[in-house]
């Protein structure tokens, strides 16, 4: 009797899941247009791609090599993916309101990561966005410079230059992965601290193939053929050691010389102003 009840419960549960999947498929076909939609950019047809509906505006443009800054990886928290959605974006979402002033909302400013592409759209983005590029770089070195900090040096493809200003940053793509911290190459002088904190026991995992994070360059702009990043490992806090460690920092700590890494950039707007006024630098 008990066995029959268990089997019946499993069958009912499976049928409910199957029904929901079918309903979602039908709803998607009904609510989303079939075929591509156009994103008109800055009223310029030549810059305006046709994309598949269903993704965020941020992801849709990135698929066409138009990279709007998003330091939080599309989480809706950094507000750096601001743009004007003039048509086709619908009403502003509650998750966006706190990032804009009343006048900005009236001027149709939105967060590209929160706007879903459902139909033809008209948007306005800064022209400098089109100078942002994407490269497949090679890891030159990845050494510890402190107990929990690594200095990652990436080489751009031959002949390519990252033309950035001090204060700029890049975004690094994080692929799907799963590995243990015991696989990291950590200099022996830091092993004792890693032993004490039981860092080797941690497990890192990323299931999202479209994950990315922003990191500021640590090298001089004149060294445009490399990208140097100083990255601190984001391990769980001591009182919540069962929490997952940082997705991007764990990925970076596991990189070895010769590995391929995809980056985009340069991004940034926090630069030294050309002024005669006195400036105070805090490090």
Which residue stretches match the model-derived regions?
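Feature marks short, highly hydrophobic, charge-poor N-terminal signal-anchor/signal peptide-like helices
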Residues: 1-13
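Membrane-cytosol interface motif
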Residues: 36-55
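Residue-level marker of beta-strand positions
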Residues: 56, 80, 169, 257-260
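Iron-sulfur (Fe-S) cluster-binding segments and ferredoxin-like electron-carrier domains
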Residues: 58-69, 79-130
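Ferredoxin-reductase
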Residues: 138-257
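FNR/FR-type flavoprotein reductase catalytic core
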Residues: 243-283
């Amino acid at each position: 009797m008990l066995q029959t009840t268990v089997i019946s419960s499993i069958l009912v549960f499976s049928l409910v899941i199957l029904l929901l999947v079918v309903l979602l498929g039908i709803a998607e076909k009904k609510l989303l247009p079939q075929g591509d939609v156009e994103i008109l950019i800055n009223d310029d047809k030549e810059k305006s791609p046709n994309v598949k509906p269903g993704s965020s505006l941020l992801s849709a443009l990135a698929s066409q090599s138009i990279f709007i800054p998003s330091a939080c990886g599309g989480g809706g928290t950094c507000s750096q993916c601001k743009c004007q959605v003039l048509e086709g974006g619908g009403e502003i979402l509650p998750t966006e309101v706190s990032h804009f002033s009343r006048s900005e909302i009236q001027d149709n400013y939105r967060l590209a990561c929160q706007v879903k592409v459902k139909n033809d759209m008209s948007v306005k983005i800064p022209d400098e966005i089109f100078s942002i590029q994407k490269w497949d770089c090679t890891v030159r070195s990845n050494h510890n410079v402190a107990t929990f900090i690594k200095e990652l040096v990436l080489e751009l493809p031959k002949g390519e230059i990252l033309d950035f200003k001090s204060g700029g940053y890049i975004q690094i793509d994080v692929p799907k992965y799963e590995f243990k911290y015991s696989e990291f190459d950590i200099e022996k002088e830091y092993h004792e601290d890693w032993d004490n904190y039981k860092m080797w026991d941690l497990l890192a995992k990323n299931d999202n193939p479209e994950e990315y994070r922003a990191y500021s360059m640590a090298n001089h702009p004149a060294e445009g053929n490399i990208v140097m990043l100083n990255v601190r490992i984001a391990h769980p806090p001591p009182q919540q050691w069962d929490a997952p460690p940082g997705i991007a920092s764990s990925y970076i700590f596991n990189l070895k010389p010769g590995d391929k890494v995809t980056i985009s950039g340069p991004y940034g707007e926090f630069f030294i102003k050309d002024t005669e006024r006195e400036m105070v630098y805090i490090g």
